[in-house]
């Protein structure tokens, strides 16, 4: 049996050890850090680029917060208590030993992120009328 197959078999038979890749939350925290990085740098980008509107900034922030909320939702469903990291990991001076937050704390952050995001993401017009595009090419 290949190593990956063994890890999956161990996962399904509840013979789980900490270095089993099927139980790693590293990929979730990579995505969370990317979202936090967007939230950290996007306001500065908008301030420097006159073509990057505040509406676009808010939409991008809402998307990042929504994706971060989804990651935390999956994490607490799987692990219950997880570290709640809301700042981007930039540089080496960051404390990498973050205490695990309670499930309630993480749920409150998920709700806060989604409540904030709903005003900027759900009412956007994502599709362009074909007739508008047609005028561009005539």
Roles of regions detected by a PLM:
Residues 2-79, 95-108, 114-130:
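Conserved, well-structured interaction surfaces
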Residues 76-88:
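Short, well-structured active-site flanking segments
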Residues 88-95:
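Short glycine/proline- and charge-enriched loop/turn segments
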Residues 130-138:
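Aromatic-lined, polymer-binding surfaces characteristic
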């Amino acid at each position: 049996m290949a190593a990956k197959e063994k890890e999956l078999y161990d996962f399904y038979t509840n013979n789980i050890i900490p270095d089993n890749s099927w139980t790693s939350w590293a990929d979730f925290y990579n995505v969370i850090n990317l979202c936090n990085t967007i939230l950290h740098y996007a306001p500065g980008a908008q301030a420097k680029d006159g073509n990057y509107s505040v509406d676009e900034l808010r939409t991008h922030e809402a998307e990042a917060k929504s994706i971060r909320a989804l990651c935390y939702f999956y994490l607490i469903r799987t692990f219950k208590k997880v570290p709640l990291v809301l700042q981007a990991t930039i540089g080496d001076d960051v404390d990498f030993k973050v205490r695990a937050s309670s499930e309630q704390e993480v749920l409150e952050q998920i709700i806060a992120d989604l409540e904030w995001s709903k005003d900027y993401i759900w009412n956007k017009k994502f599709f362009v009328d074909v007739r508008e595009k047609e005028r561009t090419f005539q």
